[in-house]
Amino acid sequence: MTNVIEEKNENYPIKIKECLSDYKPIYYRGNLSLLDKPSIAIVGSRKASSYGKSCARALAKCAVEYGAVVVSGLALGIDSEAHSACLENGGVDVFYPKRNQAMQKRIEETGLLLSEYEDGTRAQRYTFPVRNRIISAISDAIVIVEAGSRSGSLITAECAQEQGKEVYSIPGNITSPGSLGTNKLIRDGAVPLINFDELFEDLGLSKSNKKIDQIFLSKTESRVLEVVKGGSELSIEQIRHIIDIDLAEINAIITILEMKGLIFCEMGKVSIANLWK
């Protein structure tokens, strides 16, 4: 179910209010309080290179380790890599707008979906710059991972600069058309991001030291987690057979453990989240 929060509501996201003069009602699913947590936007080209994808995934994983929320737009390429890596490593993320249904469902359960548009609104050329200004507004820092000279992510960087946000850019091969935008950002004053730890230290964050034993688990949840830790990739049916509980209960427990960032479930296969390996 999609919720809406009006402009005059006292709980309207403060980050959007502070950055935008023309803010509108926000439609959302998931945990709106994530907007109060430290966050970084990870954006870039849809036609990402293997280098760009690798950087996006590594940065998202690092964000999880520092306890930061990952924000992106769920476009192909860099955005999708960032969301996927964040979920795989037990993190939480926010994306705007709602597009990929499978990813949308997973983020809805553990993170936040956010849009200025009602369900059913078709994406138009003008909606993407609108999206980009929201992405930068709800983020504490913006990282452009890989971008050509006409990449839409450069609009996000421009919005961030107008909003007084720090823009980071990952340097790329100077002979690659896909890195022209990111390299130009650095030339024009963006912070060259060559050490991911420095970004999070700039935000005043330190690496998460939470342990599994510090997270409350019921007796059955603990049993399921132990089974998952003992295997590589197990099907839900295999786990149910080992523990001998009914399918409805095991499905509920899998969902709870995934929401707690302890496991990763995709295509019916369950594995321990990378952060806990």
Residue ranges and their predicted role:
Residues 2-277:
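Glycine-biased, small-residue-rich flexible motifs in mid-sequence functional cores and linkers
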